[in-house]
Amino acid sequence: MSQASSTDTPFVIAGRTYGSRLLVGTGKYKDLDETRRAIEASGAEIVTVAVRRTNIGQNPGEPNLLDVIPPDRYTILPNTAGCYDAVEAVRTCRLARELLDGHNLVKLEVLADQKTLFPNVVETLKAAEQLVKDGFDVMVYTSDDPIIARQLAEIGCIAVMPLAGLIGSGLGICNPYNLRIILEEAKVPVLVDAGVGTASDAAIAMELGCEAVLMNTAIAHARDPVMMAEAMKHAIVAGRLAYLAGRMPRKLYASASSPLDGLID
């Protein structure tokens, strides 16, 4: 990643340019109406959906999430949440492509266990390689290991999405130093995925130089999800602007704001 300039560059995923750098999930809301209102307040244009946990057409007799997040308004990003090996993940992506009429953009996540929800990077690499061969545009959830992030980009993933903290933990940016290394080496967009708990966490991720942030629980489990969604929208914008502006250097000692020359006695 090159050093920031004061001129912004577009946020492009799979050849499409987006105005919002906030991506949101659809789980954990109390009902579909709250889901709709929070997503609208967030200003997000990309919305991720857990194919194995959400009805997007595979169950005709049940409420369809796509009725409240219509694909003509949002880019639907099907994800493989709940998959624990490469075979499951690939199968889920193929199902999503069938349900969404040939839609190739997917978010790959292969989990290691139910307690930590850490990514299983071995299975993630296997699944990513197969999905890229199958013609999918793969955005991939991964650890904050810079080597794994590099390998996923080399395989052909169009974006790498390292965790900032455990999924659903709200712990914030636990290891900014690894994220900085990933960002310095990045040849594809880097998005923080998981760990964000409040607006300041999102701003920090953007100040580090991430292209975007994906979140769900931070909004859905807030006391007022719709208000938090709006807060996150502004945090993403503020963080990006701060990154482009360039923060002042950190100093050990004070530095007076006003010059000492010409002081009135």
Curated annotation (Swiss-Prot):
GO terms for molecular function: thiazole synthase activity. It catalyses: [ThiS sulfur-carrier protein]-C-terminal-Gly-aminoethanethioate + 2-iminoacetate + 1-deoxy-D-xylulose 5-phosphate = [ThiS sulfur-carrier protein]-C-terminal Gly-Gly + 2-[(2R,5Z)-2-carboxy-4-methylthiazol-5(2H)-ylidene]ethyl phosphate + 2 H2O + H(+). The keyword Lipid metabolism does not apply. Its EC number is 2.8.1.10. Keywords: Cytoplasm, Schiff base, Thiamine biosynthesis, Transferase. GO terms for cellular component: cytoplasm. InterPro entries: Aldolase_TIM (IPR013785), Thiazole_synthase_ThiG (IPR033983), ThiG (IPR008867). The gene is thiG. 1-deoxy-D-xylulose 5-phosphate binds at G168, A194, G195, N216, T217. Belongs to the ThiG family. This is Thiazole synthase. The active site is at K107 (schiff-base intermediate with dxp). The lineage of its organism: Bacteria, Pseudomonadati, Pseudomonadota, Gammaproteobacteria, Pseudomonadales. GO terms for biological process: thiamine diphosphate biosynthetic process. It is found in: Cytoplasm. Catalyzes the rearrangement of 1-deoxy-D-xylulose 5-phosphate (DXP) to produce the thiazole phosphate moiety of thiamine. Sulfur is provided by the thiocarboxylate moiety of the carrier protein ThiS. In vitro, sulfur can be provided by H(2)S. Pathway: Cofactor biosynthesis; thiamine diphosphate biosynthesis. It comes from the Bacteria. It comes from Pseudomonas paraeruginosa (strain DSM 24068 / PA7) (Pseudomonas aeruginosa (strain PA7)). It holds the Pfam family ThiG. Homotetramer. Forms heterodimers with either ThiH or ThiS.
